[in-house]
C-alpha cells in the first residue's frame, strides 16, 4: 500500500469548497494575513451560481452589503456581472429597502475567480476532500481523494449540497452534489463518524429554457431600475466601492403565469413525485417551495407568477423563477408549455430536487467552530441555510474566526480575544449567527428583515457605517476602501454639524417658500437638521431656501455631477435625521437588554440540578448549553419566566458561591441524547 503524501507546506486555514461560503471564507482569512488553502473539486466552478442567477433581495441584500462593508467580494462581483438591478420596497421605509440584481453567471464567476487568484496569502488546489485529519479532539488538516494530506491549524468546511447529495427527477434518483458534479460521500461518512448531530434537507431548481423558443410578446416585460420603462434614475450599485465599476449591458426580465391547465398537469404527476411518494426525506425551503408544493398547499389559487430571468449576455438560456420542480420530465415538459409565451418552449436542462446532509448548527460555538472538534468550522448550507447571500455571510464570518484562532495559536497580537461576534443590533450577520446557534433549523433557513428586531438600525445604506471600521481593525479592509469610507464618514459628520449650526428665521422666510419646502410656515427659529426631521422635507428643498443661502456649494456640485459619494452622504444624513427618534428608542432597548444579553452562563453549570426550572426547560438548556443569558432566552421552548428563574438562581448561587456544577455522572449526557 502506497504511503500517504504529506504536502510540504503547512497552512493556517484550509477552506473546503469553492462556492459562495468557501470563497468569502478563503478571501477573509487571507486578507487577515493567514496562509490559506482553498480546496475545490473543480477550480472551474469557483463562485458558481448553482441555482438562480440573482443576488440580493429582502434581507439577503442587507447581508451582501454587510459582507461588502468588510471587504468581501460578492457585491463587487455582482456589480461587474449584474445585468439588471432593482431596489425592492423603494416606496417603503429605508429599513426594508433592498437591492436585488440579476447576474450574468459567466461574468460573476470570472469576477470571483480573478479575486481569488490575485489575493495574497491564498493558494488554490483542485482536489475533492475525502477525509479530515484529526488528532485527539482537534482537526489538523484535510485529506484529498488521491491521499494528499494538507496540514493546517484550522479547517473551514463549506460543502454546500455535496454531502451525500442525491438528485431526484420523478421516481429516478442518482448520487450528485449538483447536476454534473459528484457528491462528497466519503467526507459525509467521515463527519458522521465524528458523532456530529446531522439531518437531511432538500432544495430544488427549475428546468432551464431556450429563450429563442419563448414568445416574449405574450409575456409582461420587467425592466430594471434605470432602464427604459423602469424606475427613473441611475442603475443601482451593490458595493460601497461599486460606483467606479461600469455595469455590463442591462437586460429586462419577463413575467408569465401558471393557469388552471398548468395546475392540472402538475397534479397529474403527484403519484410520481418524489415529494409525495416518500422518496425524499429532507425538508425543503418554505420560502422557495417547488411548484408542486405550491399547487398542493394553495389549491384555491388560480395562478402563480413566473419570472423569466436571463442567465447572461452570451447565452439564450432562461431561468424560470417559480417552477422549481422534481416532477418527472414528461410532466415538466407539459407544464412549461402550458404557460403563455411558452407554448413552443424547449427545455435545455430538466429541473430537479437535491437532498443533502446538514449538521445541526446548535452544535456549533458562537464562532461557528464545532464543539466536538477544535479548529473545525462550518459555514453555508452545511449549517442548514439556503441562499448564496446567507452562505457568503457565514463564510466570511467563519473565515474571520478561523483566522483569529490561528493568530491566538501562533501567539500573534489579537485584540478580539480569538473571536469576532457581531451582536443582533450590529448586523444582520449577527441575527443569522444567533438564530442558527440558538434555535437551530427544521427547514432551510433564509434571511428576512422581519427576523431582525433592530432592523431600523440595520439598514442597507449604513452597513459601511456599522461595519467597515471593525473590518479595518480585523485586517479585512484595504487602503482604497478605508479611504473611501473615511471620506464618506467625515463628510456626513461635517455636513450634519453644518446643518445643526444653520438657523432659519421665520421673519426672513417668505410664506410661499415655507409652504413649498416645509409644507407650512414656521413660527420660531429652527436649525436645518431639525427641519430635515419632518417627514415631507428633503435635503434638496432645504438647500433651495432663501435663494440657496444654506447650500453647501462643494456637495451640491458633486451631487450635480452624479458623484456617488455626495449622494450617499446626503442619503445618510436624511435617513438618520428622519428616523433619529425611532433609532434612539431602539438604542435604549439595546442598552436595557445588553446587561442580561451578555451575562455569561457558567460553562460547567449543571442545568439538571436547577430545581426551580421545569424538567423540560432543564433538559432543553442542558442540550443546548447556551453561552449567555441572551442566547438562552432565544432558544425555542424557553419562556421569559424560565429566563427570570434562571437569573434568580444565578444571583442566589453567585452570592453563596455555590453554583451547582456538572457532576461526573452521565445525567447531562443522557439529557442531551
From Swiss-Prot:
NAD-binding protein involved in the addition of a carboxymethylaminomethyl (cmnm) group at the wobble position (U34) of certain tRNAs, forming tRNA-cmnm(5)s(2)U34. Gene3D superfamilies: FAD/NAD(P)-binding domain, GidA associated domain, C-terminal subdomain, tRNA uridine 5-carboxymethylaminomethyl modification enzyme MnmG/GidA. It comes from Polaromonas sp. (strain JS666 / ATCC BAA-500). This is tRNA uridine 5-carboxymethylaminomethyl modification enzyme MnmG. One of its GO terms (cellular component) is cytosol. GO terms for molecular function: flavin adenine dinucleotide binding. Keywords: Cytoplasm, FAD, Flavoprotein, NAD, tRNA processing. NCBIfam families: mnmG_gidA. One of its GO terms (biological process) is tRNA wobble uridine modification. Its cofactor is FAD. Homodimer. Heterotetramer of two MnmE and two MnmG subunits. InterPro entries: FAD/NAD-bd_sf (IPR036188), GIDA_C_N (IPR049312), MnmG (IPR004416), MnmG-rel (IPR002218), MnmG-rel_CS (IPR020595), MnmG_C (IPR026904), MnmG_C_subdom (IPR047001), MnmG_C_subdom_sf (IPR044920). Belongs to the MnmG family. The lineage of its organism: Bacteria, Pseudomonadati, Pseudomonadota, Betaproteobacteria, Burkholderiales. Its main location: cytoplasm. Coiled coil: none annotated. NAD(+) binds at residues 284-298. FAD binds at residues 17-22. SUPFAM superfamilies: FAD/NAD(P)-binding domain. The keyword Cytoplasm applies. It is found in: Cytoplasm.
Amino acid at each position: 500500500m502506497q504511503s500517504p503524501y504529506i504536502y510540504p507546506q503547512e497552512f493556517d486555514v484550509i477552506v473546503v469548497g469553492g462556492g459562495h461560503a468557501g470563497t468569502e471564507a478563503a478571501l477573509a482569512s487571507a486578507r487577515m494575513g493567514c496562509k490559506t488553502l482553498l480546496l475545490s473539486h473543480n477550480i472551474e466552478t469557483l463562485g458558481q451560481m448553482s441555482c438562480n442567477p440573482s443576488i440580493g433581495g429582502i434581507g439577503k441584500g442587507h447581508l451582501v452589503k454587510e459582507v461588502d462593508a468588510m471587504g468581501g467580494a460578492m457585491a463587487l462581483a455582482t456589480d461587474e456581472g449584474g445585468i439588471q438591478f432593482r431596489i425592492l420596497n423603494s416606496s417603503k421605509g429605508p429599513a426594508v429597502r433592498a437591492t436585488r440584481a440579476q447576474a450574468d453567471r459567466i461574468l460573476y464567476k470570472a469576477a470571483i475567480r480573478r479575486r481569488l487568484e490575485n489575493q495574497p496569502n491564498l493558494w488554490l488546489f483542485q482536489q475533492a476532500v475525502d477525509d479530515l485529519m484529526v488528532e485527539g479532539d482537534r482537526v489538523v488538516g484535510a485529506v484529498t481523494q488521491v491521499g494528499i494530506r494538507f496540514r493546517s491549524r484550522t479547517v473551514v468546511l463549506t460543502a454546500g449540497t455535496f454531502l451525500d447529495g442525491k438528485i431526484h427527477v420523478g421516481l429516478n434518483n442518482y448520487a450528485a452534489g449538483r447536476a454534473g458534479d459528484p457528491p462528497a460521500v466519503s467526507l459525509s461518512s467521515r463527519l458522521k463518524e465524528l458523532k456530529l448531530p446531522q439531518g437531511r434537507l432538500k432544495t430544488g431548481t427549475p428546468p432551464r429554457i431556450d429563450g429563442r423558443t419563448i414568445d416574449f410578446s405574450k409575456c409582461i416585460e420587467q425592466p430594471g431600475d434605470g432602464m427604459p420603462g423602469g424606475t427613473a434614475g441611475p442603475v443601482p450599485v451593490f458595493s460601497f466601492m461599486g460606483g467606479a465599476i461600469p455595469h455590463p449591458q442591462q437586460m429586462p426580465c419577463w413575467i408569465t403565469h401558471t393557469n388552471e391547465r398548468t395546475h392540472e398537469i402538475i397534479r397529474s404527476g403527484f403519484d410520481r413525485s418524489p415529494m409525495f411518494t416518500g422518496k425524499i426525506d429532507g425538508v425543503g425551503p418554505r420560502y422557495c417551495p417547488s411548484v408542486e408544493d405550491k399547487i398542493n398547499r394553495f389549491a384555491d389559487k388560480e395562478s402563480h407568477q413566473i419570472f423569466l430571468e436571463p442567465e447572461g449576455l452570451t447565452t439564450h438560456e432562461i431561468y424560470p423563477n417559480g417552477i422549481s420542480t422534481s416532477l418527472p420530465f414528461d410532466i415538466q415538459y407539459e407544464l412549461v408549455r402550458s404557460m403563455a409565451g411558452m407554448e413552443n418552449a424547449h427545455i435545455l436542462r430538466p429541473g430537479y430536487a437535491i437532498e443533502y446532509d446538514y449538521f445541526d448548527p446548535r452544535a456549533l460555538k458562537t464562532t461557528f467552530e464545532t464543539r466536538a472538534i477544535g479548529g473545525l468550522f462550518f459555514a453555508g448550507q452545511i449549517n442548514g441555510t439556503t441562499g448564496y447571500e446567507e452562505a457568503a455571510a457565514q463564510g466570511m464570518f467563519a473565515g474571520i474566526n478561523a483566522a483569529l484562532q490561528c493568530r491566538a495559536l501562533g501567539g500573534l497580537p489579537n485584540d478580539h480575544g480569538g473571536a469576532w461576534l457581531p451582536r443582533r443590533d450590529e448586523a444582520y450577520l449577527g441575527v443569522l449567527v444567533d438564530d442558527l446557534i440558538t434555535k437551530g433549523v427544521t427547514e432551510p433557513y433564509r434571511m428576512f428583515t422581519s427576523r431582525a428586531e433592530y432592523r431600523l438600525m440595520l439598514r442597507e445604506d449604513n452597513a459601511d457605517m456599522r461595519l467597515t471600521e471593525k473590518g479595518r481593525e480585523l485586517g479585512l479592509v484595504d487602503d482604497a476602501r478605508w479611504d473611501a469610507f473615511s471620506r464618506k464618514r467625515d463628510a456626513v459628520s461635517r455636513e450634519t454639524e453644518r446643518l445643526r449650526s444653520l438657523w432659519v428665521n421665520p421673519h426672513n422666510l417668505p410664506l410661499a417658500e415655507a409652504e413649498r419646502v416645509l409644507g407650512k410656515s414656521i413660527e420660531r427659529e429652527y436649525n436645518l437638521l431639525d427641519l430635515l426631521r419632518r417627514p415631507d422635507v428633503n435635503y434638496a428643498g432645504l438647500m433651495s431656501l432663501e435663494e440657496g443661502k444654506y447650500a453647501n456649494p462643494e456637495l451640491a456640485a458633486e451631487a450635480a455631477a452624479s458623484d456617488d459619494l455626495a449622494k450617499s452622504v446626503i442619503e445618510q444624513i436624511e435617513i438618520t435625521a428622519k428616523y433619529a427618534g425611532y433609532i434612539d428608542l431602539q438604542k435604549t432597548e439595546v442598552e436595557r437588554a445588553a446587561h442580561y444579553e451578555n451575562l455569561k452562563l457558567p460553562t460547567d453549570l449543571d442545568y439538571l440540578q436547577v430545581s426551580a426550572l421545569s424538567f423540560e426547560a432543564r433538559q432543553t438548556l442542558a442540550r443546548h448549553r447556551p453561552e449567555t443569558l441572551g442566547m438562552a432566552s432565544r432558544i425555542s421552548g424557553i419562556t421569559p419566566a424560565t429566563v427570570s428563574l434562571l437569573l434568580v438562581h444565578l444571583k442566589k448561587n453567585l452570592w453563596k458561591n455555590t453554583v451547582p456544577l456538572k457532576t461526573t455522572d452521565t445525567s447531562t449526557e443522557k439529557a442531551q441524547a
